[in-house]
Amino acid sequence: MSIMQVEVVSGEQKIYSGEATFIVVPTVQGELGIYPRHEPIMSLVRPGALRLTVPGEDKEVLVAVSGGILEVQPDKVTVLADVAVRSAEMDRARAEEAKKAAEAGISQAKDDKALAEAHKALAAAIAQLKTLDYIRSHKK
């Protein structure tokens, strides 16, 4: 079985560091599926669910990413995410409340910095909601 090293890092912390046999990353071009020995590429990450197939695990490892940069090398994938949260740490009610607060922050922003922070918070909330929707739609 071929494996690759995967690093998912946000500004706050390392979210995942380990091996994977397959990874799906939400990019601005669409969802990108990556197997070991993939051609080198770089892409912008869009808000959504990053999915990892990990050796020895029967369930995918899910991480909500709000944006960032993806770098793929034949034996390593690195995702530098603006914000990243593991699925186990997510809560739908909190994510929906965060989305409402971010939308209010966008409409009430008094300067560019406040507007940028509100957009970042909105992207993080949307990423969590998309990940939670993926989990709900794939429950058995």
Swiss-Prot record:
Q: Where is the signal peptide?
A: none
Q: Which UniProt keywords apply?
A: ATP synthesis, Cell inner membrane, Cell membrane, CF(1), Hydrogen ion transport, Ion transport, Membrane, Transport
Under the cellular component aspect of Gene Ontology, which terms does the record hold?
Answer: plasma membrane; proton-transporting ATP synthase complex
Q: Which GO terms describe its molecular function?
A: ATP binding; proton-transporting ATP synthase activity, rotational mechanism
Task: Give compartment(s).
Answer: Cell inner membrane
Chief localization: membrane
Q: How does it sit in the membrane?
A: Peripheral membrane protein
Matching entries from Pfam families are given as: ATP-synt_DE (PF00401), ATP-synt_DE_N (PF02823)
Q: Function of this protein?
A: Produces ATP from ADP in the presence of a proton gradient across the membrane.
Assembly and interaction partners: F-type ATPases have 2 components, CF(1) - the catalytic core - and CF(0) - the membrane proton channel. CF(1) has five subunits: alpha(3), beta(3), gamma(1), delta(1), epsilon(1). CF(0) has three main subunits: a, b and c.
Family membership: Belongs to the ATPase epsilon chain family.
Its recorded name reads ATP synthase epsilon chain
Taxonomic source organism = Neisseria gonorrhoeae (strain ATCC 700825 / FA 1090)
Highest classification ranks of the organism: Bacteria, Pseudomonadati, Pseudomonadota, Betaproteobacteria, Neisseriales
